[in-house]
């Protein structure tokens, strides 16, 4: 199962295993600070396949992060979204998942934990 792990840059996720479903064999993420970095570190330290989609600024300019987010969710069977309640990028992912009927689990967290 391909599990996208996305979230606000100011957040960190400890014990990602508590959120991942059984059978998760691949982590899909965007390579940014915060949640994406936690996802990368988890995948690498647990021997999971890691697929990262980075924003293509040369191709898409300012809309590159949003285009990247679409690519992430299109390559996932499930999306785990860790949101600080403010981040526009994570909010965009949540809305896109719902409008495309892509399974998404949302965890709203503060920057302090």
Report residues per predicted region.
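Acidic/glycine-enriched connector segments
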Residues: 2-3, 7-111
């Amino acid at each position: 199962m391909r599990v996208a792990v996305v979230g606000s840059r100011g957040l960190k996720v400890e014990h990602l295993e508590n959120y991942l479903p059984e059978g998760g064999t691949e982590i899909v993420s965007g390579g940014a600070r915060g949640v994406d970095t936690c996802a990368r570190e988890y995948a690498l330290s647990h021997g999971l396949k890691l697929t990262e989609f980075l924003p293509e600024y040369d191709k898409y300019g300012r809309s590159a992060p949003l285009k990247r987010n679409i690519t992430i969710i299109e390559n996932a069977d499930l999306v785990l979204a860790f949101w600080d309640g403010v981040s526009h990028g994570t909010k965009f992912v949540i809305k896109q998942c719902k409008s495309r009927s892509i399974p998404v689990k949302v965890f709203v967290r503060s920057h302090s934990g």
